[in-house]
Amino acid sequence: MARSKTSQRWLKEHFDDPYVKMAQRDGYRSRASYKLLEIQEKDRILRPGMTVVDLGAAPGGWSQVTSRVIGDRGRLIASDILEMDSIPDVTFIQGDFTEDAVFARILEAIGDHPVDLVISDMAPNMSGVRAADQPRAMYLCELALDLAGRVLRPGGDFLIKIFQGEGFDQYHKQAREMFDKVQMRKPLSSRDRSREQYLLARGFRGE
């Protein structure tokens, strides 16, 4: 079957992408690793010994970065609907985050340990129809914020991929009510044509 012009363009962009080449060189599973590395360089959200939850983790780029920083004393719980090859000392839970049973399994894996940081690079399968994609993306963001509100220690941080559009302003307001400081980040490694940004919320206020 002949490839469409769109898929041909994506393949050319992918293989010409310097971050794809860097990921291959540096041993990262995904170019997305560099988005987290850029944010880490600027904001220092990861530290040795932390307990971290990584949502939308597959294929494991963010988990690799996180694991390398938090080290042996740290704890990382990762989850995705897709399979992910194992990473040493990472607890992985496969399943649909929107399902109550999977949400409960993540909470069970966390247990009574206070979480220092929740990170999420989740996104729904995009149809290209913004009116359909945006609500689905925001629903994932809302679930992630709900999880963060349940498991973060006071003073903990939250980083999430989010798309500008319907529901964004309300979400931003909700995050400001829950955290001391909320900032937006657009890493250089995020593709120019992408609407994605990252919301960084610091200083969870707790109950």
UniProtKB/Swiss-Prot annotation:
A GO CC term assigned to this protein in UniProt: cytoplasm
Q: Write the record's keywords in alphabetical order, separated by commas.
A: Cytoplasm, Methyltransferase, rRNA processing, S-adenosyl-L-methionine, Transferase
Please, one GO biological process term? RNA methylation
Subcellular location per the Swiss-Prot or TrEMBL entry = Cytoplasm
Any one GO molecular function term? rRNA (uridine-2'-O-)-methyltransferase activity
As its record notes, the protein acts as a catalyst of: uridine(2552) in 23S rRNA + S-adenosyl-L-methionine = 2'-O-methyluridine(2552) in 23S rRNA + S-adenosyl-L-homocysteine + H(+)
Specify the superkingdom: Bacteria
- The main enzyme category here is transferase
Q: Which InterPro entries does the entry mention? A: RNA_methyltr_RlmE, RNA_MeTrfase_FtsJ_dom, rRNA-MeTfrase_E, SAM-dependent_MTases_sf
Q: What does the entry list as the binding residues for S-adenosyl-L-methionine?
A: 60, 62, 80, 96, 121
Cite the EC number.
2.1.1.166
Active site as annotated: 161 (proton acceptor)
- NCBIfam families cross-referenced by the UniProt entry: PRK11188.1
Recorded hits in HAMAP family, A to Z, give:
RNA_methyltr_E
Family label: Belongs to the class I-like SAM-binding methyltransferase superfamily. RNA methyltransferase RlmE family.
What this protein is reported to do is described as: Specifically methylates the uridine in position 2552 of 23S rRNA at the 2'-O position of the ribose in the fully assembled 50S ribosomal subunit.
Question: What protein does this entry describe?
Answer: Ribosomal RNA large subunit methyltransferase E
Which species is the source of this protein?
Pseudomonas aeruginosa (strain ATCC 15692 / DSM 22644 / CIP 104116 / JCM 14847 / LMG 12228 / 1C / PRS 101 / PAO1)
| Name of the encoding gene | rlmE
